[in-house]
Amino acid sequence: MPRSWMVTSVVLAAACTVNAAHWATGTTIRVWIDPAGAPAGGDRLVERAMQTWTMAADSRFRMERTAARDTAGIRVHFFTRDWRFGMTQARPDSRTGLLTEAEVVVAADADGDALDHQIVVYLTALHELGHAIGLSHSADSADIMYLFRLPGDSERFFGGYRRRLRSPDDIGTARATGLSPSDVRELRGLYE
């Protein structure tokens, strides 16, 4: 490997570490899902993403849906996709450094068939909720926290997940969580 590539690899690896900010360990994080602009079944896919992170956290925190926007720590909205699939703004408390709220936006539309659409909504919600709980981007394309950087990344990523499914009912189940062992390790390390 040329020396310049090694330096670039080290810089990328350093840039893809876990944030120091996270929610208080043991907390219940209330999540409100905005019905405005939500695709059919979109709220159910976000709930599956919440359950996936809750299971991976292994009692370090719990995500729970709430009907009350004002008391939610995380608020999820849907938007018409531009060049992004989603985005998140997480806010830490200035005194404690702990996360106290986050705004998550997930694309309500996607190219492809109905299954592709469900996959994009679920995996985007999973990725963006990962940011909302304190995780940064990863350089490993096997991770849900992977940052698309190359042409074709999104097709490879979503297509790879689709190949693991037997049916749409597998989305967000133990058979197809969308998390890699590294995602789980990073999460648990952040909340130790």
Predicted regions and their residues:
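Acidic/histidine-rich, surface-exposed loop or edge segments in extracytoplasmic proteins
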Residues: 24-38, 102-109, 163-170
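Short, intrinsically disordered low-complexity segments
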Residues: 1-2, 64, 148, 174
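Residue-level signal for functionally critical sites in structured catalytic/ligand-binding pockets
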Residues: 2, 14, 54, 103-107, ...
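Metzincin-family zinc-dependent endopeptidase catalytic domain
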Residues: 43-143, 149-153
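Disordered inhibitory propeptide/activation segment of secreted metzincin zinc metalloprotease zymogens
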Residues: 2-42, 50-51, 81-96, 179-182, ...
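Second-shell loop/turn segments in exported
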Residues: 32-43, 109-120, 170-177
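Extracellular (secreted or membrane-anchored) zinc-dependent metallopeptidases
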Residues: 141-192
